[in-house]
């Protein structure tokens, strides 16, 4: 039984449901997308299915409606305007926090 749990644990990776708003005043968090991984607070991987949604590990599912979201974000034009700097990664295994002091923003 213990081995079964250890084998299934990686399958239990979850994401958050994110909605991108049009106006800054509607957002929970202001986000800036950086050019380099080393500049980011969070490395984000976009997941394909809503069923993977929960948790706070940089796995994001973008929903179509605000009411479906866990968090509403607004993409800003400059790093100084942001609460959180993110970098989009190519693989799910690369996602995660680089700056854990900002982790509270997505709870």
What spans do the regions from the language model cover?
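Repetitive, compositionally biased segments used for assembly/scaffolding
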Residues: 16-107
């Amino acid at each position: 039984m213990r081995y079964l749990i250890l084998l299934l644990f990686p399958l239990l990776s979850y994401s958050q449901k994110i909605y991108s708003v049009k106006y800054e005043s509607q957002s929970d968090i202001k986000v800036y997308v950086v050019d380099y991984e080393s500049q980011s607070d969070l490395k984000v991987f976009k997941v394909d299915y809503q069923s993977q949604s929960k948790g706070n590990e940089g796995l994001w599912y973008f929903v179509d409606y605000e009411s479906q979201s866990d968090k509403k974000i607004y993409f800003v034009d400059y790093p100084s305007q942001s609460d959180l700097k993110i970098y989009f990664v190519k693989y799910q295994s690369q996602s995660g926090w680089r700056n854990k002091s900002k982790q509270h923003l997505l709870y």
